[in-house]
């Protein structure tokens, strides 16, 4: 059995873990000769989940100021404030620039690597940690953590290869449950619980929500589901799902009703995919939808195809279009359903029309405005951790000091990143949470270590 001693051990080589390593090494190296900061990553290389972020482009932060940024953080944005001000979005861009990665900013204050390659973000994070003196060890699957208050080195971390790493401080940054193929399998929740921490209810967020009839859900597939309302993304599309899949709606309104009450509404882009309703506003609404479904509530999505037009004005416009079609000699001998299709081509994307007709069989030129302003879809489920962007819930932030991210229950233990009961909307918020909390945890662990050794 191989024993290795370190000053600080960081479990997890994702966004939070790499930033914790950089912050810890930078801080400790200024006060101590030959500090040893070790990152233990179970995957063959670090930053696996970052690599798939933003379809490989990696929207790594958002440049909104704190007042606007905090509106996109759940459930208690105030907890993030000390971490954010220690490492703001602007500072993160400078941080990456200092190790050779330039950025660009696109619509919605979203920042991307100038190369549009997520791998550049990972490479920059690894460089920053290693330049500061941290060691990143891959293929190191942690199987046990022991906290021994009487020992000089308070933490003993055992890996599957029988190697044991001991340290004064331990930072756990193992991520959540989303995209388990990248290594996020929820290990950190168990370790946190073993050390006395409570875990707030976990559920998928920033995921596809599935309308009734969108997928061929069978009793057998329901039995295989891991949680109430979970519909595996691999479940085949139904006839309706196939008609809708691939449609991308621009500048529409989306309202979510929970048990008949309006819960939220958004304006923007909505996509029908092989998973269900996605896109920026679909993802943003998913948090409330999933939570409601898990708790047994009825969820309904209402799409406003013409949010910029009042229904009265839309009715006038449609009546005018209908009269023009009726007067057109080319329509004189056409059946009503064919003239109605012509009308639909003037108010809907062509690709969407077959699905719209099938799902709204009673719509006609008189009721079309009402249907366009309120296309209702009852929601039966959601895509789970296999393809959700982030895990909501996590280690209770009530048990963690926000100014240091140290455990209130176990001295010398720190948490950062998705493992915390802290998550954001789509748009770069979740990676910034990971960067800011990871960096502060690393700095705090080093500062505490320095103060204890003076």
Range-by-range predicted roles:
Residues 45, 66-68, 76, 85, ...:
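Residue-level recognition of phosphate/Mg2+-coordinating polar/acidic sites
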């Amino acid at each position: 059995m191989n024993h290795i001693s370190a000053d600080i051990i960081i479990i997890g080589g994702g966004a939070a873990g790499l930033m914790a390593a950089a912050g810890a090494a930078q801080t400790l190296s200024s006060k101590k000769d030959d500090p040893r900061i070790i990152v233990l990553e179970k995957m063959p290389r670090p930053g696996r989940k970052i690599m798939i972020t933003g379809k490989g482009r990696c929207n790594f932060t958002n440049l909104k100021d704190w007042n606007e940024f905090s509106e996109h953080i759940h459930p208690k944005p105030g907890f993030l404030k000390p971490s954010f001000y220690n490492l703001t979005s602007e500072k993160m861009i400078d941080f990456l620039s200092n190790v050779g990665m330039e950025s660009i900013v696109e619509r919605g204050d979203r920042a991307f690597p100038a190369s549009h390659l997520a791998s550049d973000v990972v490479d920059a994070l690894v460089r920053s940690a290693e330049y500061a003196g941290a060691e990143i060890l891959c293929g190191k699957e942690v199987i046990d953590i022991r906290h021994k208050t009487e020992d000089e080195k308070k933490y003993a971390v055992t890996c599957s290869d029988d190697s044991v790493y001991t340290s004064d401080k331990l930072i756990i940054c193992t991520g959540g449950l989303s995209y388990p193929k990248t290594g996020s399998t929820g290990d950190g929740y168990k370790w946190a619980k073993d050390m006395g921490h409570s875990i707030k209810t976990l559920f998928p967020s920033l995921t596809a929500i599935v309308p009734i009839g969108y997928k061929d859900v069978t009793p057998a597939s329901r039995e295989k589901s891991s949680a109430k309302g979970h519909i595996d993304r691999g479940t085949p599309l139904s006839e309706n799902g196939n008609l809708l899949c691939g449609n991308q709606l621009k500048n529409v309104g989306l309202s979510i009703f929970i048990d008949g009450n309006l819960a939220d509404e958004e304006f923007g882009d909505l996509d029908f995919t092989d998973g269900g309703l996605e896109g920026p506003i679909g993802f943003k609404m998913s948090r409330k939808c999933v939570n409601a479904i898990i708790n047994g509530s009825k969820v309904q999505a209402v799409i406003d195809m013409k949010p910029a037009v009042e229904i009265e004005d839309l009715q006038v416009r449609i009546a005018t279009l209908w009269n023009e079609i009726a007067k057109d000699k080319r329509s004189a001998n056409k059946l009503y359903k064919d003239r109605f299709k012509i009308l639909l081509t003037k108010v809907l994307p062509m690709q969407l029309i077959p699905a719209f007709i099938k799902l709204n069989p009673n719509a006609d030129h008189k009721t079309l405005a009402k249907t366009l302003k309120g296309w209702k879809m009852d929601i039966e489920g959601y895509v789970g951790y296999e393809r959700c962007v982030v895990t909501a819930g996590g280690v209770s932030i009530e048990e963690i000091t926000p100014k240091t991210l140290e455990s209130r229950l176990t001295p010398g233990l720190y948490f950062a990143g998705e493992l915390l009961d802290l998550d954001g909307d789509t748009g770069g918020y979740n990676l910034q949470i990971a960067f800011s909390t990871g960096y502060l945890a690393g700095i705090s662990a080093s500062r505490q270590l320095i103060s204890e050794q003076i």
